[in-house]
Amino acid sequence: HLDKYNQEIRKMRTDGVDVLPILTKEDAANALNHKAATLLAIEEGGAIDGSLEALRCLYELGLRAMTLTWSNRNDIADGVNEECSGGGLTTFGRKVVQEMNRLGILVDVSHIAPAGFWDVINLSTKPIIATHSCAKGLCPHPRNLDDKQILAINENDGMIGVTYARQFLNQDINKACIDDVYRHIDYMLNLMGNDDHVGFGSDFDGTTLPHDMQGVQSYKEIVEYLQSKNYSDSTIEKLTHKNALNLLQKVL
């Protein structure tokens, strides 16, 4: 099953889809010249089963981003559900971050407990990402990022992908809507003082969406909503793709 990703790429190409698997800085720079681009990522670093060699093998198969933990503890660090233990990166976890930096694999800190987050910030020599997180200042869910974490990612030259998980957008999940997506984006942009480090984070395959979103087809509505809030075309382009592609060019 390890090579399923590359099998799918080959199948798409056989079916006539102009798809680019992003493996290098040059691929990230060229992505907009193709109909579609993909990036192989793993959510939950426990997938490498305590082995740096497994991480290297996955890199050779195309892995270019990995979430260090899910919400529970693994041999890399504690997830947010383990926050009371105060656990940060383990000795092995520190080696994982260093090897990901060396190889050119994007370090994803969504799901990690605060202690581990700060360990990564202090250890990583490359920009990091929180692929699917929102602002704790608007919705105090443990999975969201507080102001200090948001500012740290800004200083790290990294990126936050705002997720559409309704429980992270609004404390009243039944009221979560596209306006909340806008509010979290706007909150982060104002806090950072720039529009270079925030983007769309989605999590379409792993959560329940707000009532006015159906899936990837809802991106048009999000963009139109941002336009209605007088966001410039330049800022919207950064949010939809440019910030992510720029980040990949710094890391891969």
Regions found by a protein language model. Name each.
Residues H1-L52, L68, A77-S85, L89-R94, ...:
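A metal-dependent hydrolase metal-coordination microenvironment
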Residues L20, A37-A41, R64-A65, G104-D108, ...:
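Structural preference for beta-strand elements that scaffold enzyme active sites
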Residues T24, G62, V107, H132, ...:
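Conserved, mostly hydrophobic/aromatic
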Residues D27-A29, A47-I48, N72-A77, I112-W118, ...:
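Active-site environment of divalent metal-dependent phosphoester hydrolases
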Residues G50-E60, E82-I129, P142-N156, D179-D196:
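Histidine/acidic residue-rich metal-binding segments in metalloenzymes
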Residues A77-D78, W118-S124, P140-L145, L169-I185, ...:
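Histidine/acidic-residue-rich catalytic or RNA/ligand-binding cores of hydrolases
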Residues T163-Y164, M192-V216:
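Short acidic/histidine-rich active-site segments
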Residues Q214-L252:
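Mid-to-C-terminal alpha-helical segments outside catalytic/metal-binding sites
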